[in-house]
């Protein structure tokens, strides 16, 4: 195709919030205008270069790589320069220069390169001096023509005929002001002009939307004065438009083509590139064979001892395992992946030597005997029936991918080891790009266009939420009628007004949705290269880290030839580590390496559904599944972990029924019984699909993996081809065509959501480990869980409730006992006794584990108090003894460590109750206490420190005050800790709730039948969330009662409207609700609400009382007299039975004519007189 003009100045959304175009859109525009090439020139970065090149090549266009950088010519002189890669050397210099802007020079003013950087890396580059934003243009705008010419000569001296003057015509005054002098200098120095047009949006009509984008970037509204704007002409113009625009400078148009013809490099994909792990003495292949064989011998030695395998059976086991090892090694080495395995093995072995807990495996890698032998995984693949071909398929070459779980607290240590081993310039994180997704873009655009908040908030709530597959705004408008109505300009159903503005917000949001908003880093991905990263990919550094970050997203990172290693931080491993540390303080050593998975206590606990804190088994539905399943082996835990997902969940009842012999398993065919027996005929695992194809239809395991993939993808053509192969193979195995087709269809259905058994098994092991710790060492386990959730008061509530359910006492926060973190208080002396894992029960000599341990509440779990403050308090106590009073506390801690909110929450949480029994008085004295702190320490620091003066300062710090009642103190605690510790506000209502048949949260689980139940339940509202679903808005409430916390939903707008006054946090309510109880757990839907006062004050009771003497009679009459209230809501009737002291039978009965308004605590007091 003959091209007359090429765009050399296009920016994509990788120029964050500056361009409204994606790389793909830029290529599409160039293609639609019949251009032969297109140049991408993002600001400061090359993040989109490979993506852009691949799109362009796919469309038959020549990609040209450029970048716009800030350059410092001399002190204080900064300007823009446009650099274009002529060849591979030029592209590598582009990578280096763009990376320099992020990694080396002082970035306080702006990201930039220096003139010296440019000279050093000029080879292979074509340079355009930017027009008004370049150094020449800036000098001319400042009337410094001589200086402009000097800079032009300097650049020409470096680049020669690779230096151009960019010229633009966007109809801007500054462009017109300098054009004549600019052209004159170019002509004088014989520097060619090249015509460009800033391309920031596709067409002129997009200018308004782009203007909104600039406002989002600046954080201002459209009405903001003196904000940055761009010309409406910054759109993708056709060649015809550009030729007409520069009709008087035809050479400037021609030079766009001439310049392009000088460029002959495009970013491309590369084969995988890894560091060489070989040494001068041994190759990678020989090294992996040696280390794997030595490792397998060690693994088998441990296996033989822990499983008590007799010597006569050991040899046959060795033969089986080494045959599998050799098979795997041959495949690994033939694929040239030996180095990959050795690299992973090296950093995992280092981690374990440092005492850093590493997960037993994750993903399909746990199916490799080589990985097990090299200590990469800790799961015996043959014992668990795992397949190597699921991880590395000899019939389909692809990179292996080990995802490694580390203790979250120490993950950084492992990464730093890798950096030190391979070099900081060869190890990097992976960039991620945050996009303007539907909800976020509506909020951003609404803010810029000044749409009132209530409209913007309602619009965003209408967009359905999906974390896995985010719903686009276009989808939402199609699926949500109210959004569709608003997009047509008809406004919102529930809010009047702003019709046109709402439509404009949605129209603009549709244009901007999907653009990149910012960059971040991948949570786990690390790349390790065999050369400096900047030789292959763009790199940058986050301002908060000294570690390089690869500027390609994960997809393009791998296409560029970089190998990703996932260093994942798993909180559960931190829980296990911390729990083991706490036990070690009691001289109890736990070693899970030789665990036999048969601890009776563990399975007894799981059978009761006690899954809180147990990895994978924490949800309500999962706990219910545990109760029904009654697991008694590790295989049950593995299966349940794999089954409890959308789709496979429907097979849980079949699995349970067959396990308990209530139903006969269906093995599909007698040949399949050995494969499906473990899962009672249910096809759960992908590995089972592979085995079925192998046994029934003669597939190799590699070919069976291709079958599994085809079934998972459900691509019709592939499925038909595979069915033909399967049926043909089955017929050869004496199976009828009809049965073969039936089995294929059944297996295909299961395979669509089959789970990777290697991953399920590895995570099942972690589940067992956490369950074992919880069942055998509950206090230490709960403390380890709590210390990971110091800022999550919902989780703290949950774990403390779990502790109470296990009869573990909770010691309220106490300034003389508590530390920064939760801790265990044990009263049994600690003995020296080491023990291994779940063999503890079989050991004659056992350490004394304190079953009466208590948990001490953490200061760091109080709002506004950090663990560091807790450490300060602990250090002071250890150095100088316990605090004697609040004044002593104030005097011993530095004033800068204590602020008003911190002191308030310490008081409200009851931390000083041991020192002072009136919290309200301390609370009212906070300002005086803080003032005294400053005065005391100032006096102490002065040369005139006087005990007498200090004594006078400390007098009358505390103001006079009455004592707060129990409920006030309870809500103090809730405000400070998000929970009730010493007393729950509903405790006093227990008796009246029983009378009114108002259920407790415990009753919901224990005393309700399956199905739908209409009940009343009471609670204190602790949290309120408003959400949107496809059906509309709904509200979830988290409530608590003295037994537990629970959640309910409100779906009815009418209920929300009628009871809005009762739905504030801290409200005490009685809820009339529908409870659906089934195998998935309990779901509560509110139908109506009452305040506690109304719910308990309008019921009639016949209160029968039996005083034993005159004194008790007097007390009853005094209390009832104070509660006489004959209004309609006070219907409690009291009857007193008087007894003769010498006769057991009652001789008189008095019924009061009055009605009483009794409170919950009154029932509590009167209950002592209700026994005859």
From Swiss-Prot:
CDD domains the record matches: DnaE_OBF, PHP_PolIIIA_DnaE1
Lipid biosynthesis as UniProt keyword: no
Primary localization class, coarse: cytoplasm
Compartment annotation: Cytoplasm
UniProt KW keywords: Cytoplasm, DNA replication, DNA-directed DNA polymerase, Nucleotidyltransferase, Transferase
InterPro entries assigned: DNA_pol3_alpha_NTPase_dom, DNA_pol3_alpha_thumb_dom, DNA_pol3_finger, DnaE2/DnaE/PolC, DNAPol_HHH, PHP_dom, Pol/His_phosphatase_N, Pol/histidinol_Pase-like
EC numbers, comma separated: 2.7.7.7
GO molecular function: 3'-5' exonuclease activity; DNA-directed DNA polymerase activity
Any one of the GO BP annotations: DNA replication
Enzyme class at the top of the EC tree: transferase
Gene3D superfamilies for the chain: 1.10.150.870, Bacterial DNA polymerase III alpha subunit, thumb domain (1.10.10.1600), Metal-dependent hydrolases (3.20.20.140)
Cellular component terms (Gene Ontology): cytoplasm
Keyword Cytoplasm assigned: yes
Record-linked SUPFAM superfamilies: PHP domain-like
Catalyzed chemical reaction(s): DNA(n) + a 2'-deoxyribonucleoside 5'-triphosphate = DNA(n+1) + diphosphate
Subunit relationships: DNA polymerase III contains a core (composed of alpha, epsilon and theta chains) that associates with a tau subunit. This core dimerizes to form the PolIII' complex. PolIII' associates with the gamma complex (composed of gamma, delta, delta', psi and chi chains) and with the beta chain to form the complete DNA polymerase III complex.
Reported function: DNA polymerase III is a complex, multichain enzyme responsible for most of the replicative synthesis in bacteria. This DNA polymerase also exhibits 3' to 5' exonuclease activity. The alpha chain is the DNA polymerase.
Recorded family membership: Belongs to the DNA polymerase type-C family. DnaE subfamily.
Protein name, as recorded: DNA polymerase III subunit alpha
Taxonomic lineage: Bacteria, Pseudomonadati, Pseudomonadota, Alphaproteobacteria, Rickettsiales
